[in-house]
């Protein structure tokens, strides 16, 4: 762990409070501001490892929660997990068989970064497009979608694609996002189905 991480107050707070990463606070803040999750919602979390959003989701809903990631996710009581690629039709089918249609899809995933900003941003947008396709396949009409993306040249295209599928779409940068980051969340409510 680098010194940047050890000096990061949000990271240290997350560890102290038992969260797996600082990302927990991003979802908490989004929920407080936009109320995207209801108490009885069934939810799929794409790119769920290490499980920090799953930890938060478990406290926000009494519904079923499924985390999907390429990497294994350590057990969290009351959470179902599926190891696989969200772009794989077999994984999508398994998710739908496990939960049926759901009320919310969240995605805090990011591709492995290469250090080349434009390349990494393009890969993040492509991942966002795949997550949107997944969401459209499993969401109930009226459902919500929350996804992390990165601002850049291709961001408006992803935003427009999401706006075409949902009645209300907003962008939001959380307080827990590091200074200088191009990270932004898209909060999409009321899936057109």
UniProtKB/Swiss-Prot annotation:
Reaction it catalyzes: uridine(2552) in 23S rRNA + S-adenosyl-L-methionine = 2'-O-methyluridine(2552) in 23S rRNA + S-adenosyl-L-homocysteine + H(+)
Binding residues annotated for S-adenosyl-L-methionine, in chain numbering: 51, 53, 69, 85, 108
Subcellular location: Cytoplasm
The entry's keywords: Cytoplasm, Methyltransferase, rRNA processing, S-adenosyl-L-methionine, Transferase
Predominant cellular place of this UniProt entry's protein: cytoplasm
The UniProt record lists the keyword Protein biosynthesis: no
Record-level GO cellular component terms: cytoplasm
Domain of life: Archaea
GO molecular function: rRNA (uridine-2'-O-)-methyltransferase activity
Pfam (any one): FtsJ
UniProt cross-references to InterPro entries, sorted A to Z: RNA_methyltr_RlmE, RNA_MeTrfase_FtsJ_dom, rRNA-MeTfrase_E, SAM-dependent_MTases_sf
Active site as annotated: 148 (proton acceptor)
Enzyme Commission number: 2.1.1.166
SUPFAM superfamilies named among the record's database cross-references: S-adenosyl-L-methionine-dependent methyltransferases
Its job: Specifically methylates the uridine in position 2552 of 23S rRNA at the 2'-O position of the ribose in the fully assembled 50S ribosomal subunit.
Protein family per UniProt: Belongs to the class I-like SAM-binding methyltransferase superfamily. RNA methyltransferase RlmE family.
Protein name as annotated: Ribosomal RNA large subunit methyltransferase E
